[in-house]
């Protein structure tokens, strides 16, 4: 039989008393009153803050949005099918953060930056708040570097600078996403990190974009944030902010980034759904009163940072879908007033075979001209005016039977210039090739060709210049100017190739 020694027992008790530390843990807890449609009403949570993350009994995460006298309205980041009335809810004391880092490049993630491409976990370098404050006035500098899209009509007439916000707006099926993907593909071999945010799109459309970018070798420097049409409204609302946080990580390390929001109309609709279910008072088109702030606080995060902060930049290309070309609707007018210009895509132009279907007359870039390279300014200076005059004359010429020779010449030149701006999808052009293309048209070197021959002639000319006049390409690319030597070289190339083209 074991002998019990009192001194041994007393020493064990004494040891346990000495090691005891009193820890009081205060947890802010509430109870679910009602749940459904991605919304939960919670009783309790007395000290919860707006935007704070909540943890439900089944592990679902929510965000407290409505703080009322007797309950809290929260939106769920999940389907919430396992949440029941009476379940406990815990306030976490945190606001939404996402992991960020270099390893995200080439990956497809959801609105909480979790990988959804089946390629395993992503090693993060840190975290960033989903809702970060935008850089202040002192933290910024004016836009002065170009961001080349590879599309002649944009780079020549509606130039975009690094740190600018340029809206892409148009009806459905007018090529808005194509403009965005071409811009991403054109950054290949450069120093720009791209983030593409797909909001409320079909999963098949997102898969197609991933395939396009992979085939073009563009996924190496691209992150895709995707919340498809079947995702909860909360996640569709958060996706653009997650994309901005991922881009900000690179911007604050001194790098240039490009972020595309495709499209913000669907984010506004998701936010409207959440707000109406939370019983917030509806305003114009049933959107809540703070829908302008929804987009302004997102787009203000795009900036060109000052020297002290490393001169990084975030260029934003938000996309808005219009209904029947109506740009005076609520969301389009809001985003037009926030951004630094817009590229307007027209369904009529698209259907008549002009692609990209950019309506040059009502598209504008408010700050990009400061970023345009000198060579482009030299050759494209009159292009927009000539096309605007051509559009006016073309409308007039339908009613007039006899036109003088000068008008006929102007119409002929305009038709060739319009042909020059047509571009196949996923085939962006480098700056030197754009300069050569525009110069050929504006200087009348296409006037003696039939309109149907223009595109094949220009394609051949570009190949001829690359092969036989490589010094022209390097000269324009390095000096960013279009000097007399470059002009002579280009004139010679046009004359030489035209002889070959006509002979064939």
Curated annotation (Swiss-Prot):
GO terms for molecular function: ADP binding; ATP binding; proton-transporting ATP synthase activity, rotational mechanism. The record marks 363 as: Required for activity. It is found in: Plastid, Chloroplast thylakoid membrane. Pfam families: ATP-synt_ab, ATP-synt_ab_C, ATP-synt_ab_N. Its EC number is 7.1.2.2. Keywords: ATP synthesis, ATP-binding, CF(1), Chloroplast, Hydrogen ion transport, Ion transport, Membrane, Nucleotide-binding, Plastid, Thylakoid, Translocase, Transport. This is ATP synthase subunit alpha, chloroplastic. The gene is atpA.
